[in-house]
Amino acid sequence: GTIGKGVAKIASDFGCKVIYYSASGKTQDVPYEREEFDEFLKKSDIISIHAPLNDKTNNLFNKEAFDKMKASAVLLNLGRGPIVNDADLTEALEQGKIAAAGLDVLGKEPIEKDNPLLRIKDSTKLVITPHVAWGTVEARTRLMDEVYENIAAFTKGEARNAVV
């Protein structure tokens, strides 16, 4: 999607070789190599998830997937919580099957007291932020400015940000 493509472009601009996996099976119009899931897992140093939750992505990153990843791999789930199995991720981190994870979504939110991820106290292995971590004062101010401009344009009968 748009977010994944944006992240891929930034990574590419920093000199990363970008590959991707498409759970939908659709080949994107991007200059990156598409891999089958198992190859994608074996080759990736960093996996950044920006996918919707559906039958094909639910529990996609589970014990089987973590067993195929590099021990030095970092997993970022910025999509939907249930794409990653929290218990299996905890085990993978505790056993050194992957190096680290960064999450702004969880399998069940708000996080429950018995979530196994809470056992991991090492912030070099696991960082969890709210899904609204983008919500800096500047971002929220810009958002409100856009809302104001859209309302002002609408009351004048003007089209703004219209895709034709």
Give a label for each model feature.
Residues 1-71:
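Rossmann-like dinucleotide/phosphate-binding beta-alpha-beta segment
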Residues 72, 78-164:
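Rossmann-like dinucleotide-binding domain for NAD(H)/NADP(H)
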